[in-house]
From Swiss-Prot:
PROSITE patterns (alphabetical): RRNA_A_DIMETH, SAM_RNA_A_N6_MT
The organism of origin for this protein: Rickettsia felis (strain ATCC VR-1525 / URRWXCal2)
Classification via Gene3D superfamilies: Ribosomal RNA adenine dimethylase-like, domain 2, Vaccinia Virus protein VP39
Tree of life domain: Bacteria
Keyword S-adenosyl-L-methionine: yes
InterPro entries tied to this protein: KsgA/Erm, rRNA_Ade_diMease-like_C, rRNA_Ade_Mease_Trfase_CS, rRNA_Ade_methylase_Trfase_N, rRNA_adenine_dimethylase, SAM-dependent_MTases_sf
Protein name (database record): Ribosomal RNA small subunit methyltransferase A
């Protein structure tokens, strides 16, 4: 039988490292709540980024997925994850930087993504995955609350911006619940939140997504600039 999440981490002397953006979750009930929010079906293929000490990993595995692939860059966590694998042979462990891996590299036809994302790369990962939306069943992600609010923001609100446009162009977005800093070790300085993104049945082409990404980057470059002025770099003859 596996020890508790906290005891398992302590047995491997794993302390959070700032360079990896690590804030560990030792509360198994919170991990279970995140997985419930995903509506994970049995026999799904699942991807988790940054499993760390394996709390969310355990909760996912308890739902009997066909496979769970975890991508972890911190070599200290690999022996701990291998011990979890002894109980769950359907766990696949990849030691790699998540930014260096595309979903197509993993051979998925469809995958469900459930992750407590490292906040310093979370937005970049979301944008990359949106371009591979045809391979994704849904994504249930923990991010900074501010980022989740921007993903879900409606037009004419202060939070509405580039991330809102791109995410809502490709997926149906739903904020699930907030997570207080006290849920983590060490507690971060900001609140977190869980967001669920479900790709639309007919997502736009990658070419269109790239164009929208380019336009919105310019359009929202400065809140005080006129959009016309911002877009002149992209469309020189705009009037």
């Amino acid at each position: 039988m596996l020890p508790s999440i906290a005891k398992h981490a302590a047995s491997h002397q794993i302390n959070p490292l700032k360079k990896h953006g690590q804030n560990f979750i030792f509360d198994s009930s919170l991990c279970d709540k995140i997985v419930r929010a995903s509506n994970l079906a049995e026999n799904s293929r699942v991807l988790e980024i940054g499993p760390g000490t394996g709390g969310l990993t355990r909760s996912i595995l308890q739902k009997n997925p066909a496979s769970l692939t975890v991508i972890e860059t911190d070599e200290r966590c690999i022996p701990l994850l291998n011990e979890i694998k002894e109980y769950y042979p359907n766990l696949n462990i990849i030691k790699q930087d998540a930014l260096k891996i595309n979903l197509t590299d993993l051979g998925y036809d469809k995958v469900t993504i459930i992750s407590n994302l490292p906040y310093h790369i979370g937005t970049e990962l979301v944008i990359r995955w949106l371009k591979e939306a045809r391979l994704i069943t849904n994504m249930t992600l923990m991010l900074q609350k501010e980022v989740v609010e921007r993903i879900c923001a409606m037009p004419s609100t202060k939070a509405y911006g580039r991330l809102s446009v791109i995410c809502q162009l490709i997926t149906k977005v739903e904020k699930c619940f907030d997570v207080a800093p006290t849920a983590f070790y060490p507690p971060p300085k900001v609140y977190s939140a869980i967001v669920k993104l479900i790709p639309l049945e007919n997502p736009p082409s990658i070419a269109l997504i790239n164009k929208v990404e380019q336009i919105t980057k310019l359009a929202f470059a400065g809140r005080r600039k006129m959009i016309k002025s911002s877009l002149k770099n992209l469309v020189p003859n705009i009037h």
